[in-house]
């Protein structure tokens, strides 16, 4: 009976891990550096931001760039000093680089956005239980949740 119970628990554990597993997607670029410039609106719990990503393609012909961008409204995207076409799906920002680039190129995209993060960035402000609490925001996004605010 103990063997059956242990086996069932092991199988249940394996099944629960598989449901939450999201494999690392293949990437088309190597991001070298990011400059993050944000303003935090504590009262509305929003982030108004501009992020610059400097990157190099990993292939010989890369003409678009997809980045995770959940809980964001993208306002503008530029490659160098030129606005480029983009669209958003529910969880990603898709950018058309206007031509193909290769691993010998180093590019910078600048993205202006507003975010209302559900996770990754947390807001604390006074409430009825803690009326003297100071306004504060802190991050705990690591690699999986930062795309909700940056």
Predicted regions and their residues:
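Sec-dependent N-terminal signal peptides
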Residues: 4-12
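Acidic/His-enriched low-complexity segments
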Residues: 14-150
């Amino acid at each position: 009976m103990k063997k059956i119970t242990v086996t069932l628990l092991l199988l249940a554990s394996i099944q629960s891990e598989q449901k939450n597993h999201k494999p690392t997607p293949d990437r088309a670029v190597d991001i070298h550096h990011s400059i993050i410039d944000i303003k935090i609106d504590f009262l509305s719990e929003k982030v108004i931001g501009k992020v610059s990503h400097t990157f190099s393609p990993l292939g010989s012909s890369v003409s678009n760039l997809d980045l995770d961008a959940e809980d964001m409204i993208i306002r503008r995207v530029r490659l160098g000093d030129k606005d480029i076409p983009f669209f958003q799906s529910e969880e990603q920002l898709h950018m058309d680089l206007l031509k193909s680039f290769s691993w010998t190129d180093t590019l910078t995209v600048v993205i202006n956005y507003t975010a209302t993060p559900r996770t990754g960035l947390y807001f604390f402000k006074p409430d009825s239980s803690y009326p003297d609490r100071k306004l504060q925001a802190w991050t705990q996004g690591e690699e999986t949740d930062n795309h909700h605010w940056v």
